Amino acid sequence: MSKPFKLNSAFKPSGDQPEAIRRLEEGLEDGLAHQTLLGVTGSGKTFTIANVIADLQRPTMVLAPNKTLAAQLYGEMKEFFPENAVEYFVSYYDYYQPEAYVPSSDTFIEKDASVNEHIEQMRLSATKAMLERRDVVVVASVSAIYGLGDPDLYLKMMLHLTVGMIIDQRAILRRLAELQYARNDQAFQRGTFRVRGEVIDIFPAESDDIALRVELFDEEVERLSLFDPLTGQIVSTIPRFTIYPKTHYVTPRERIVQAMEEIKEELAARRKVLLENNKLLEEQRLTQRTQFDLEMMNELGYCSGIENYSRFLSGRGPGEPPPTLFDYLPADGLLVVDESHVTIPQIGGMYRGDRARKETLVEYGFRLPSALDNRPLKFEEFEALAPQTIYVSATPGNYELEKSGGDVVDQVVRPTGLLDPIIEVRPVATQVDDLLSEIRQRAAINERVLVTTLTKRMAEDLTEYLEEHGERVRYLHSDIDTVERMEIIRDLRLGEFDVLVGINLLREGLDMPEVSLVAILDADKEGFLRSERSLIQTIGRAARNVNGKAILYGDKITPSMAKAIGETERRREKQQKYNEEHGITPQGLNKKVVDILALGQNIAKTKAKGRGKSRPIVEPDNVPMDMSPKALLQKIHELEGLMMQHAQNLEFEEAAQIRDQLHQLRELFIAAS
């Protein structure tokens, strides 16, 4: 089923790309475990990585810091490799509230989650591709370090069907039930099967547009065919087919029985400890909850919160790392960590937060101590599991630089010829008046300005001052949610206002070609917001404009300022030299404003598979407070459908906005009832 990676692009590597590709490939072939690609904004880092994958023909996992950037990368990789398996693996929860206990108020919060069926299917498709093929690129979020079903058990549970094999119909149905497929003769959907005489139709859990028809003659498989579940039209007949489990967490019956005995042993030991410490309530609570889970596992093969018993189900010892997506990646696989200066610290922080919450649950008798082993990987475990790694960032962190021995692959030259901004340092005493005159110059020629301050109070005062002097200005602060933030950025690009003031405007993916000036107030105050890395990221916001300029207001040049200015000058000189040698005139970017709000659109298109155009999704209206319970319930169902539609298109911000509205509506419904 595997094909060689075939790169599809109208462009050939140019600028620094050929040298970067050569050095990365040489490093990988020489066995280097860690390499860092320092690629500035707009230099084509994704294209470079795609070339490395295509040249070396190795299965690859790309880690992104969040779902939105993962969606962007998935869309780009899908365009580069249309004939290969490009997969998407992020958390399948549209909404997730983990179970927790607050001792101070004696409040237990039940686990509550809304699973996105479409993303669950994409996750299953990703692991299937990793097990079956070598031409696979999986774009994943930090969800990749969380526990997943054991690949060995997952492989054991698969159902292999071959034309001519002898198998009883009941045996097939029994195996499908073990794989957690449900029989549904009416509504045929993903993860179900239907039976009509000697014909069994199965809708694979990892597929969104193809189902399998198994035709039996007595106890022999006579024919296997793939068909469109919507139209019923046969697509092709095949000699064999493998049906994967409906979920990553299925376990063979004998393993469940063994796990139940081990759970009973741990329960007995834990009860003894609690009683010795005179914790009678906790002992009773733990016994009741665990016995209920054991009964469910005995009858159904699973229970709510079965992941808390994952240590027993996968046969691991106490403290051993859980199986994750890394266990599905072949030994010669390649790991690419995008925006590594953000992603690496994220990976390091996941374990501690999860541990703190679960320790409280164990202490107060809500869970057995083994629940602590249902966790994300520790950072040292991630390091041990990670294959050869390429870190990609415009501002690599100390960790990446240390791991790659300070030997960084530079990709500074942009094929468009755009130069890094000119940097000026000006005194603090006159910074506000000087900034006002600069803003007026930019506004007169229809260009935009970003201003970063150190404190919320200063940002508010500056915004007020600029408004009083007739400037069109907005203020971006931490209370603004993701969707509104994107709308403010869109309005800035459209020219609804000219100046955006904020405290931390260096978020990755902030892509605004219209911004020609970045002003950094109090640049000489050393700290997190004025570190070398933060300054380079902020200065880079003006790097997509031909007239890009950055003004740093400070009475002295700090070490961080000196390094940031030096690095920007180095990049600028290198680009200028390249432009002169190749006769390139810098070209401004004319990126459509709609792009920034439609990051999930590519994925929705790739998944549509020619089934007609997607309907425009209408935003929900404001809900009157005096609606009847019946009308409220109708509105709740309507918004749930809308939320799922947004989530299916990977428009997570819109889905989250509707989810928050649903919470309010449900509270109103309870009060009205």
From Swiss-Prot:
<keyword id="KW-0227">DNA damage</keyword>
<protein>
    <recommendedName>
        <fullName>UvrABC system protein B</fullName>
    </recommendedName>
</protein>
<dbReference type="GO" id="GO:0005737">
    <property type="term" value="C:cytoplasm"/>
</dbReference>
<feature type="domain" description="UVR">
    <location>
        <begin position="633"/>
        <end position="668"/>
    </location>
</feature>
<dbReference type="InterPro" id="IPR006935">
    <property type="entry name" value="Helicase/UvrB_N"/>
</dbReference>
<keyword id="KW-0067">ATP-binding</keyword>
<dbReference type="Pfam" id="PF04851">
    <property type="entry name" value="ResIII"/>
</dbReference>
<dbReference type="GO" id="GO:0009380">
    <property type="term" value="C:excinuclease repair complex"/>
</dbReference>
<keyword id="KW-0742">SOS response</keyword>
<dbReference type="GO" id="GO:0006289">
    <property type="term" value="P:nucleotide-excision repair"/>
</dbReference>
<dbReference type="GO" id="GO:0009381">
    <property type="term" value="F:excinuclease ABC activity"/>
</dbReference>
<keyword id="KW-0267">Excision nuclease</keyword>
<comment type="subunit">
    <text>Forms a heterotetramer with UvrA during the search for lesions. Interacts with UvrC in an incision complex.</text>
</comment>
<dbReference type="InterPro" id="IPR014001">
    <property type="entry name" value="Helicase_ATP-bd"/>
</dbReference>
<dbReference type="GO" id="GO:0009432">
    <property type="term" value="P:SOS response"/>
</dbReference>
<dbReference type="Pfam" id="PF12344">
    <property type="entry name" value="UvrB"/>
</dbReference>
<keyword id="KW-0234">DNA repair</keyword>
<dbReference type="InterPro" id="IPR004807">
    <property type="entry name" value="UvrB"/>
</dbReference>
<dbReference type="GO" id="GO:0003677">
    <property type="term" value="F:DNA binding"/>
</dbReference>
<dbReference type="Pfam" id="PF17757">
    <property type="entry name" value="UvrB_inter"/>
</dbReference>
<dbReference type="Pfam" id="PF02151">
    <property type="entry name" value="UVR"/>
</dbReference>
<feature type="domain" description="Helicase ATP-binding">
    <location>
        <begin position="26"/>
        <end position="414"/>
    </location>
</feature>
<feature type="binding site">
    <location>
        <begin position="39"/>
        <end position="46"/>
    </location>
    <ligand>
        <name>ATP</name>
    </ligand>
</feature>
<feature type="domain" description="Helicase C-terminal">
    <location>
        <begin position="431"/>
        <end position="597"/>
    </location>
</feature>
<keyword id="KW-0228">DNA excision</keyword>
<comment type="similarity">
    <text>Belongs to the UvrB family.</text>
</comment>
<comment type="function">
    <text>The UvrABC repair system catalyzes the recognition and processing of DNA lesions. A damage recognition complex composed of 2 UvrA and 2 UvrB subunits scans DNA for abnormalities. Upon binding of the UvrA(2)B(2) complex to a putative damaged site, the DNA wraps around one UvrB monomer. DNA wrap is dependent on ATP binding by UvrB and probably causes local melting of the DNA helix, facilitating insertion of UvrB beta-hairpin between the DNA strands. Then UvrB probes one DNA strand for the presence of a lesion.</text>
</comment>
<dbReference type="GO" id="GO:0016887">
    <property type="term" value="F:ATP hydrolysis activity"/>
</dbReference>
<feature type="short sequence motif" description="Beta-hairpin">
    <location>
        <begin position="92"/>
        <end position="115"/>
    </location>
</feature>
<dbReference type="Pfam" id="PF00271">
    <property type="entry name" value="Helicase_C"/>
</dbReference>
<keyword id="KW-0547">Nucleotide-binding</keyword>
<dbReference type="InterPro" id="IPR041471">
    <property type="entry name" value="UvrB_inter"/>
</dbReference>
<keyword id="KW-0963">Cytoplasm</keyword>
<dbReference type="InterPro" id="IPR027417">
    <property type="entry name" value="P-loop_NTPase"/>
</dbReference>
<dbReference type="GO" id="GO:0005524">
    <property type="term" value="F:ATP binding"/>
</dbReference>
<dbReference type="InterPro" id="IPR001650">
    <property type="entry name" value="Helicase_C-like"/>
</dbReference>
<dbReference type="InterPro" id="IPR036876">
    <property type="entry name" value="UVR_dom_sf"/>
</dbReference>
<dbReference type="InterPro" id="IPR001943">
    <property type="entry name" value="UVR_dom"/>
</dbReference>
<dbReference type="InterPro" id="IPR024759">
    <property type="entry name" value="UvrB_YAD/RRR_dom"/>
</dbReference>
